[in-house]
Amino acid sequence: MGHSKQIRILLLNEMEKLEKTLFRLEQGYELQFRLGPTLQGKAVTVYTNYPFPGETFNREKFRSLDWENPTEREDDSDKYCKLNLQQSGSFQYYFLQGNEKSGGGYIVVDPILRVGADNHVLPLDCVTLQTFLAKCLGPFDEWESRLRVAKESGYNMIHFTPLQTLGLSRSCYSLANQLELNPDFSRPNRKYTWNDVGQLVEKLKKEWNVICITDVVYNHTAANSKWIQEHPECAYNLVNSPHLKPAWVLDRALWRFSCDVAEGKYKEKGIPALIENDHHMNSIRKIIWEDIFPKLKLWEFFQVDVNKAVEQFRRLLTQENRRVTKSDPNQHLTIIQDPEYRRFGCTVDMNIALTTFIPHDKGPAAIEECCNWFHKRMEELNSEKHRLINYHQEQAVNCLLGNVFYERLAGHGPKLGPVTRKHPLVTRYFTFPFEEIDFSMEESMIHLPNKACFLMAHNGWVMGDDPLRNFAEPGSEVYLRRELICWGDSVKLRYGNKPEDCPYLWAHMKKYTEITATYFQGVRLDNCHSTPLHVAEYMLDAARNLQPNLYVVAELFTGSEDLDNVFVTRLGISSLIREAMSAYNSHEEGRLVYRYGGEPVGSFVQPCLRPLMPAIAHALFMDITHDNECPIVHRSAYDALPSTTIVSMACCASGSTRGYDELVPHQISVVSEERFYTKWNPEALPSNTGEVNFQSGIIAARCAISKLHQELGAKGFIQVYVDQVDEDIVAVTRHSPSIHQSVVAVSRTAFRNPKTSFYSKEVPQMCIPGKIEEVVLEARTIERNTKPYRKDENSINGTPDITVEIREHIQLNESKIVKQAGVATKGPNEYIQEIEFENLSPGSVIIFRVSLDPHAQVAVGILRNHLTQFSPHFKSGSLAVDNADPILKIPFASLASRLTLAELNQILYRCESEEKEDGGGCYDIPNWSALKYAGLQGLMSVLAEIRPKNDLGHPFCNNLRSGDWMIDYVSNRLISRSGTIAEVGKWLQAMFFYLKQIPRYLIPCYFDAILIGAYTTLLDTAWKQMSSFVQNGSTFVKHLSLGSVQLCGVGKFPSLPILSPALMDVPYRLNEITKEKEQCCVSLAAGLPHFSSGIFRCWGRDTFIALRGILLITGRYVEARNIILAFAGTLRHGLIPNLLGEGIYARYNCRDAVWWWLQCIQDYCKMVPNGLDILKCPVSRMYPTDDSAPLPAGTLDQPLFEVIQEAMQKHMQGIQFRERNAGPQIDRNMKDEGFNITAGVDEETGFVYGGNRFNCGTWMDKMGESDRARNRGIPATPRDGSAVEIVGLSKSAVRWLLELSKKNIFPYHEVTVKRHGKAIKVSYDEWNRKIQDNFEKLFHVSEDPSDLNEKHPNLVHKRGIYKDSYGASSPWCDYQLRPNFTIAMVVAPELFTTEKAWKALEIAEKKLLGPLGMKTLDPDDMVYCGIYDNALDNDNYNLAKGFNYHQGPEWLWPIGYFLRAKLYFSRLMGPETTAKTIVLVKNVLSRHYVHLERSPWKGLPELTNENAQYCPFSCETQAWSIATILETLYDL
């Protein structure tokens, strides 16, 4: 929690291409690239074009980033490479896996804008922009007086349309010379230059705190640009783009048709010059189809001259010794387009023709027949082209008529009037700078390069087109199909793919860009969606070179967020223009406010180190852009104020266009407007059309609203709530999460004119939570008594008879809009002000500043003060007081440091059944579910899901807001315990005392902040008490190690038998009932939730498979010792019980637990400092003889080494007994024979054996339970005989005891047994040798079919594996491929030949390795089934009642042994194999890491169904699963 630097983590995943994902970051952030699960362990290199500090950015120059591994260990799951972001723009990254590109994307870093003499930062969310049409500013020396209107209206950014020389059309966006300042700005006696502009821009920045940006137009130039005539190659002309010739021919024909219509030549045919109705439209369609198209014969440009082709074909057929180039048989005869687009200029591939049409002999008749077939095919191909062009012509007519309808008939169109040469029927698509001559002679020009190069295509836009496709390039038929909405004043520019393709154009536009970037701090990319991306990239790179913090804005009309993101990410667009005018009602306008910025009110505090999430582009939300229709016409003049207020309350940049605030009642045309803007004059009268001031339009209100917008952005009011009060009233709240102040703007929109539409007099009451400090602004749109609007000839004047009446910073009781305000309470700590309105007429706004009530404000301040110990984020708004609860004066970390790991188990974990033993339970959230744990982890698992998504509507948050139940549960549960646990509870209770005093909507956020602070501190406390392996380990290791805290605890009733009173440092406690001292040793739960409490908590086998990973590797040596000794006390018949049942209810029905116990003693001795001392520790024997009644602790103590010897002796002697209380009372499924337990050691082989076909004494212990399927009482996997892992474990034990006995540490060198009445000694040396000599001979299935050691060659179905058992009662079971041999490989690797072992491991990898676990049976086995369903009871013998528990489902714990075996033997195979194996291990383990992170139990399951599908019958977190994965990481 303690980070203050903002760090974002980007996880890299294999083949993940994120080019359409927007990642936005700020300068000063650190970006870390980390490997996702699919890349763990692989050799990955990250490249980026983000430059080294101090270097200039070069888009093409990539560098690799160095990996940093915080743990400096082989387990590098935490490794990362990083960028410290100090430069704005768009930067690319990609990564290679080996030498192959595996994924990549872009990051966009925001610019930092600075203004004022002191160069202070202007945050992007504070931007208030106003657009000016540059040509309406008049002579340059008058600009300041006109621009002052923006300053006085509170704007801090001015956007100028282009300042360059305009083309003939006088459109602001049709530039004749990109390098020259518009001469209109100069006086006859004074020529102004770019330097003058630069000085003004600098003055505005320094003195007015106003930033200036301007447009860059890269797509087109004015048709009369001098330079385009000198460099026609810069345009799409008929020389460099001959594919446009047919379109040009059509365009000329339509122009001539238009001229004839204008001259009345078609009046007789039903087309007058003034097009007025559908009849005229139909006549146009008829003339084009019947008259124009047939004459043009456009299809001829796409056809073959058939006679010519046939003659060529005939010549080739009759040629002597002609060579036919072999052609692809799949190629068919098609027309090859003539690249010069001449009529009948197309051809076909004669090679294909010659192999398609083959004469049957060389005679003239055969050749003639062939030519006829060829002729017929040519006619067919030409017909296909005719049909295609006809299809294009249909579209062309439809588009043309649509255009005519819009321009001349549509109500919303410009109604151009009669067809004239100035206003033709349709806009021309091409320039024609020559005198008009006869049409056929004009057409001949297209083939004369010196003429054709000046026939250039105009620019425009295509509705619904793919913006990433250039519509003027070959392959596009836009010009022919008349789909272009054309700008007849501009020529489209043709850049090609790189500067070398058109050097003059690239150099000219680069110079234009550099002039712009020299004088302006930002640019607006005009027509961005049609600008070739590579061109815009190149130009913006040049601009950023001069202006590193370039502010780039653009408007995109792609219609797709994904496509928008392509432009934003590639170009590094800072803000996308969004239009409020797109909203059709107030509800939609409010939705846009919520969409374009801010987070919900009461949001969770996000950590400084967190994943990098995809973003939506930062918005520049405009109430109107210069392209929009006039809102006064579209809506009403009364809506200007409320809509502006709504837009300004958005948590993003906001903007407007000059004329809106003055209420100009028409659109100010970028083409035809030639009047000048009004000037600022504080004294001007409303009747003065050339000057404005605060009395004009909504300027006074705009000033107040702009200042408020900037204040909210600067002071961190980043949370937003939008309330649709009724169909016209929208209330927008901006909230500061640090000082908990809100600003609430209530706007009554007027989308319909109040004079002509009905608005209700009744306005709903509003409830505003908190205390209203002031009315920031109240404003009403009113009429005043002045002359109505008349359009002025010289100035762009607004509506004089409508203005606003405003009052700022007044008290609530002074308001004229609020009738009365009452105070109500909602619950004990929620103050609400009920507002009743009386004058909130359409076109009015009222803005309140609201604080928490003083009581809640203090409570929040105190909470923030105590939370600063966890994060500096809470410093702002914190309040220190002296009278807080004394416990809060203790830093939480020092309180936590007193806790033991057993106490942390109670605070953090404990599932339902554990908690029930204490009379409690897990917290249940109504209408959702119960938490997984009663401790803090239960809450944190849910919060970790909902915090990053800010899911405040989750039932968890609803429960917190509805009442204090969960809050009290958390603290009371701990206070009811004793010692430091209760102290932690009291600390939480003291924090919750203040939490309960704040408004309910803030409770989820602060509850989370308190808990995450406490929780992370408690985790640190846990790790500090563990081994250095954990403390210095990766996040994965640390999170796995918490399994030790999760599964090891002390219940109300002790689970372990009582240890010898002679043993030192055993933990004790006072019994709550008897008040007597009792032992309270930690026991290890086998798994949660099923094996967690009562007699089913502790199992010998599970405990000792898990003990090394859960307790020894984590450094919990005393707990490990106590568990080893407690189980030692229960030894009986030479066996350790499986079900422990406190020793009294123990069942001695498993053959393997004793060997796992011995393995753990060996591990303890090797891993723990002075570990061998355990051998002398006293063991309190519960059953000194096999038939003793259970003795109280301390009655008979023995050193551990004697107990070990007894176990070895009993096995060599042979074990045979019947379980006590045999029958349904201890096992309702077992058949009678199953209760007979046998075990022993084979005299020949030294192998431990045991069991019968009615019991299952190994870990694969499923007993049939179904009467219906007739498998009740039959074990699914008896594994009788010598199970491979038991042989391996016994070999490990014997070898170890032999080593100790040689050093006289273990006092016994042999075991003594009675055979035929005689005492026989078997030395450990001999026993060890027997196993060594026989293991591979009898367990390995040779690849040689004639191997004499193979007793049942007919049962072999996989060679090169190790058997699962030897000597089973059903011999075929020996030959099943299961993962158990890998256990033997780890504990007794000396039994295996490296090459054979490696082969077997490769087979296991191919057949058994699953995503999380190992298949428990070969999928090729006939009884394999990978899905375990214990509830299913059917007739299927192999499945019913979960009979296939170990016949396929993927168990997790064996995967640890498989991976450890792979690691061990790979090191013997050589460095190359080792490297590959490490990659495999890391890759497999990464899936466990992902599961662990995502699991609400924060554990690894017992098993999964096949392919890692969830198994509902599995424990959610299992001790041995966690343990063996930790052991693998330890081995790594």
From Swiss-Prot:
Reaction equations catalysed: Transfers a segment of a (1->4)-alpha-D-glucan to a new position in an acceptor, which may be glucose or a (1->4)-alpha-D-glucan; Hydrolysis of (1->6)-alpha-D-glucosidic branch linkages in glycogen phosphorylase limit dextrin
Gene transcribed to yield this protein: AGL
Any single biological process term in GO: response to glucocorticoid
Organism for this UniProt entry: Homo sapiens
Source domain of life: Eukaryota
PTM sites of type Phosphoserine: S64
Keyword set, alphabetical order: Cytoplasm, Disease variant, Glycogen biosynthesis, Glycogen storage disease, Glycosidase, Glycosyltransferase, Hydrolase, Multifunctional enzyme, Phosphoprotein, Transferase, Ubl conjugation
Record's protein name: Glycogen debranching enzyme
Record family assignment: Belongs to the glycogen debranching enzyme family.
Pfam families in alphabetical order: GDE_C, hDGE_amylase, hGDE_central, hGDE_N
Presence of the UniProt keyword Phosphoprotein in the record: yes
